[in-house]
């Protein structure tokens, strides 16, 4: 732990915190600490300077010795020995990770804060055109020590938000100027930060808001504006939904591949005006009459149909990819988690048979949670049916099949046609597994390593061929089809 010496003063005129600091010996090291940006001579000279009192703070100017470029690293876990304008000494302990602020022997500091808060409020009221600027006008409203402390707490919270600013004049040849706000680094680590401080046995707690109210407010805001924004599941940044399609559903903040609906994937891969859907009127008839206590299967199907505008969890058809005729099937995770029922299996099987008869290359985009439990063993049989059709397509007809694994691809889809492609392509960070992490851990009583079911880890194990981002995906597929003798229709 390092010791930092501060000369600090709260200016009465504008309520700003101005400072000078220098680094003294480390508590663990007997030798002097070298500061590459500050010379020892400057430190010695500055320590001998007089400290201006708060009475002439408006006209005083400070020669700031050392600037701070990264305040988070500067006060991540340090103790500061501070001397105020009255030459009273006290210490401040910062621990940003645990969100702790401790003040010792800080009577004069708190009184100076109090005075500064009044000055700050007067200054603000003058700027806002307030009629009253009497520093003692509100003091009598707080007739108990507890009320006054609460008022100080609120003022301190507001003060940290709006006023406490370290203006650091960094000594260098170019005489650069930088400004950093304390609050952004102390309190922005958590949206509901708590700064705990203790002064001679009394506890001073500053809370922006309680965790419960904060989380409930966030939930309300998310629900209210979810039609406008999509939250990234990786960095939790917000993406404007209107622009997502043009950006290929890539997070603007971190580039993470967000879930993409089947219609937009078709627009991404298929040339405009060439898409011809197949069997889009095929719907499930509830073959085993599955009725749950919450909602009957038929009602659930109707609900997803009205919500997504699709009849089932897969869209199949033909089109052109850079002029190359292809047969393509795209699964949609928004329709019952992309689960594979009898209709999904039948549509994919018919697509494969059509591609075999027309000698078309086949492209299947997988996004599924597995077999659909509401259809029992009939959904499991789709795995064998699709695999059988693919065997004829690949082995007997010698045609080219490419499967694309997106997030998530799990269960029966992984165990059947998802892993049968001549070329298996995965999207970055895609979740690919047979059984989910929780199922494995509860069944085998073993911990599944973090990230062991993601595309990058599985790629190292040889589970599929390339990992291709969405931006170059269409070009990569076009090159693969050209390599296998599939050429555009308009090429002589």
UniProtKB/Swiss-Prot annotation:
GO terms for biological process: fatty acid biosynthetic process; malonyl-CoA biosynthetic process. Zn(2+) binds at residues 232, 235, 251, 254. Its cofactor is Zn(2+). Binds 1 zinc ion per subunit. Keywords: ATP-binding, Chloroplast, Fatty acid biosynthesis, Fatty acid metabolism, Lipid biosynthesis, Lipid metabolism, Metal-binding, Nucleotide-binding, Plastid, Transferase, Zinc, Zinc-finger. Its EC number is 2.1.3.15. SUPFAM superfamilies: ClpP/crotonase. Signal peptide: none annotated. It is an enzyme of class 2 (transferase). Pathway: Lipid metabolism; malonyl-CoA biosynthesis; malonyl-CoA from acetyl-CoA: step 1/1. Component of the acetyl coenzyme A carboxylase (ACC) complex. Biotin carboxylase (BC) catalyzes the carboxylation of biotin on its carrier protein (BCCP) and then the CO(2) group is transferred by the transcarboxylase to acetyl-CoA to form malonyl-CoA. It comes from Citrus sinensis. GO terms for molecular function: acetyl-CoA carboxylase activity; ATP binding; carboxyl- or carbamoyltransferase activity; zinc ion binding. Disulfide bonds: none annotated. It catalyses: N(6)-carboxybiotinyl-L-lysyl-[protein] + acetyl-CoA = N(6)-biotinyl-L-lysyl-[protein] + malonyl-CoA. NCBIfam families: accD. A zinc finger (C4-type) spans 232-254. It is found in: Plastid, Chloroplast stroma. The keyword Membrane does not apply. Acetyl-CoA carboxylase is a heterohexamer composed of biotin carboxyl carrier protein, biotin carboxylase and 2 subunits each of ACCase subunit alpha and ACCase plastid-coded subunit beta (accD). This is Acetyl-coenzyme A carboxylase carboxyl transferase subunit beta, chloroplastic. It comes from the Eukaryota. GO terms for cellular component: acetyl-CoA carboxylase complex; chloroplast stroma.
């Amino acid at each position: 732990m390092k010791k930092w010496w501060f000369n600090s003063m709260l200016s009465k005129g504008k309520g700003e915190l101005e400072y000078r600091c220098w680094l003294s010996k480390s508590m663990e090291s007997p030798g002097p600490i070298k500061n590459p940006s500050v010379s020892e001579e400057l430190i010695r000279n500055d320590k001998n300077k007089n400290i201006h009192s708060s009475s002439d703070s408006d006209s005083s100017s400070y020669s700031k010795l050392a600037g701070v470029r990264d305040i988070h690293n500067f006060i991540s876990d340090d103790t500061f020995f501070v001397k105020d304008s009255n030459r009273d000494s006290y210490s401040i302990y910062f621990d940003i990770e645990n969100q702790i602020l401790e003040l010792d022997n800080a009577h004069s500091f708190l009184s100076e804060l109090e005075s500064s808060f009044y000055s700050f409020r007067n200054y603000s009221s003058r700027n806002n055109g307030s009629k009253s600027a009497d520093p003692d006008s509100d003091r009598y409203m707080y007739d108990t020590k507890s009320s006054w402390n609460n008022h100080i707490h609120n003022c301190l919270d507001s003060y940290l938000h709006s006023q406490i600013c370290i203006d650091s004049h960094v000594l260098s040849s170019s005489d650069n100027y930088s400004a950093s706000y304390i609050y952004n680094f102390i309190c922005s680590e958590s949206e509901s930060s708590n700064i705990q401080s203790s002064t001679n046995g009394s506890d001073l707690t500053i809370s922006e808001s309680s965790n419960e109210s904060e989380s409930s407010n966030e939930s309300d805001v998310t629900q209210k504006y979810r039609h406008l924004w999509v939250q990234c599941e990786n960095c939790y940044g917000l993406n404007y939904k209107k622009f997502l399609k043009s950006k290929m559903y890539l997070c603007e903040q971190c580039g993470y591949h967000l879930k993409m609906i089947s219609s937009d994937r078709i627009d991404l891969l298929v040339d405009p005006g060439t898409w011809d859907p197949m069997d889009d009127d095929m719907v499930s008839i509830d073959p085993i009459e599955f009725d749950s206590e919450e909602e009957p299967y038929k009602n659930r199907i109707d609900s997803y149909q009205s919500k997504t505008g699709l009849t089932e969890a897969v869209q199949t058809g033909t089109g052109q990819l850079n002029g190359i005729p292809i047969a393509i099937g795209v699964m949609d995770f928004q329709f019952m988690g992309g689960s594979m029922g009898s209709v999904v299996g039948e549509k994919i099987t018919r697509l494969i048979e059509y591609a075999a008869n027309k000698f078309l290359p086949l492209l299947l985009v997988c996004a599924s949670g597995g077999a659909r439990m509401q259809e029992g063993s009939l959904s499991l049989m789709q795995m064998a049916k699709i695999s059988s059709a693919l065997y004829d397509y690949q082995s007997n007809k010698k045609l080219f099949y490419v499967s694309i694994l997106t997030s998530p691809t799990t269960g029966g889809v992984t165990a059947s046609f998802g892993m049968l492609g001549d070329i298996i392509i995965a999207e970055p960070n895609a979740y690919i597994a047979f059984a989910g992490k929780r199922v494995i851990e509860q069944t085998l009583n073993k911990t599944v390593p973090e990230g062991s079911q993601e595309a990058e880890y599985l790629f190292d194990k040889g589970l599929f061929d390339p990992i291709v981002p969405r931006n170059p995906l269409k070009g990569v597929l076009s090159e693969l089809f050209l390599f296998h003798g599939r050429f555009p229709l308009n090429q002589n």
